[in-house]
Amino acid sequence: MQYKNLGARGPRVSTIGFGAWAIGGMNWGPTDDDVSKKALHAALDAGVTFFDTADVYGFGHSEDLIAEVIKERGKGDLIIATKAGNDFYHAGKESDSGYGAIQQNYKKKYLIEAAEKSLKRLGLETLDILQLHSPDLEKLEWDDPWEALTLLKEQGKIQHAGLSIQSFKESEQAHLLERHKGLLDCIQVRYNLLERKAEKLLFPEAIKYGVGVIVRIPMLFGLLSGKFNRQSIFEGDDHRRFNLDAEKLKSYLGKMESMSDLYERYPDFSPAQVALRFGISHPACSVSIPGGKTPAQVNENCAASDMPAIILHPPESGLDD
């Protein structure tokens, strides 16, 4: 396992992290808590030190599982990054889970309360990183979310402040970095072989301001692992029913076929490993957070850290306009 500093102010982290959305038990198909915990232990055994979760993943369940493993193995030098802003506590009609429909909530009071609830679930006195969870751009024009992060830092309840960036214009994303460069320590960015917009403007700005980059969706919801085809169907509450519908699958798979030469260069590595290694090869990027529901998936992911760097020019991949 290789390690990098998360920007100029962030902690040192493993270049392959553990994305804990799937183990929350919602939106990714069936999961088993015992297997999920084994996956977390496998990550620790492989040298993973960076674990990314969110309060909304499984309505707190992802954080609960991480807390159980921390109790068993100790916190040590682990970096736990969570997120807040998708309010499942107060909104709408209650479901069987006891929570209502999720709504964005970036009011100062709510974010502070959400951070305190995450601290309690995780069994920690301070959060290593708290990230605003993919807010719409208009929410980021408010003072509330930034005041909340500032206060939580001052109170010692969080060590570092981050932003998981939603899909809006690169120029607007870069402006946020400039505007909040003194507060933001890291950003989480959608970046993979088929989605490379961030290279144009956002990554240079992140380097300029010393803001660390966490690579999210590095395998495009599993598509870049090579295990899906045009006939793939996602069932039930699996979010990929919408994020990888038939039309998107066709488009993405067509782009993947044009990159066959890339995979042939690395015959000893899986498509998933090639995708992951690409994501952490850019100098702006410190850590990638693939999901892993089983120990086997985790071990495959972690092996990508020790691959040679994969640097591509725009014509060689799906650099989007």
Language model regions located:
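N-terminal binding-site loop/beta-alpha segment at the start of enzyme catalytic domains
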Residues: 1-78
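Beta/alpha (TIM)-barrel catalytic core signal, keyed to glycine-rich beta->alpha loops juxtaposed to Asp/Glu
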Residues: 134-320
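A short, structured active-site edge motif that brings together acidic residues
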Residues: 77-89
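Active-site groove signature of glycoside hydrolases
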Residues: 119-138
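Active-site mouth loops of central-metabolism enzymes
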Residues: 22-34, 96-109, 138
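Acidic (Asp/Glu)-rich catalytic clusters
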Residues: 10, 69-75, 120-123, 153, ...
